[in-house]
């Protein structure tokens, strides 16, 4: 496990303990009973692909540990609207406070501003966070294989699916992929960023693509910065993408999305 991931997870344990002092898990469970049905995250991606278009999960991210602040003028609702107009199929919203300058409210603001399904992009390690994601309005959660043991993967993915959410399971290498396909989550995200070196290579997706079962939807994540990157992955049969940094640095994120994915 990388040094930065170890630090993030240690902080996440502290954060969950702090949140439990204010809102109990039982209270979150009770709130989940009265919520509207989630928007279909995996279904939205599949529908776009069936139509013949690339399925884009557009990320709303203020900052990252490696790059610092990506966007000073950060307005989640406006960014969400821009992404929807630009052709995104789904959104991903960073809610981690300490390392990514995210906030739970960013997810709610983005989701309320558009009709797209939303992924809560955070470091989920405990059932408390799954219930919390559902209460916030998330339609999908992220599970990072490098951060979890097999029992956690089974339990957390099962709980999310039981609550009506989809699950994006993120892997970085073949060993993690073999673990990911043992659970029934519909989405497999291949992160092109090496967690140890933070180097990025699209070869990670291209090398591992053939090992993803046909009944799972592969999502390529990180390092997709240009239309040439998109064309390279599309030519190899990759149809779903998670992109954040390239859009966050653009004056108009949705227009940047449209230019990268839909103008040839």
From Swiss-Prot:
Keywords: Amino-acid biosynthesis, Aromatic amino acid biosynthesis, Decarboxylase, Lyase, Tryptophan biosynthesis. GO terms for molecular function: indole-3-glycerol-phosphate synthase activity; phosphoribosylanthranilate isomerase activity. Its EC number is 4.1.1.48. GO terms for biological process: L-tryptophan biosynthetic process. Coiled coil: none annotated. Pathway: Amino-acid biosynthesis; L-tryptophan biosynthesis; L-tryptophan from chorismate: step 4/5. InterPro entries: Aldolase_TIM, Indole-3-glycerol_P_synth, Indole-3-glycerol_P_synth_dom, Indole-3-GlycerolPSynthase_CS, RibuloseP-bd_barrel. Belongs to the TrpC family. The gene is trpC. This is Indole-3-glycerol phosphate synthase. The keyword Lyase applies. Pfam families: IGPS. It catalyses: 1-(2-carboxyphenylamino)-1-deoxy-D-ribulose 5-phosphate + H(+) = (1S,2R)-1-C-(indol-3-yl)glycerol 3-phosphate + CO2 + H2O.
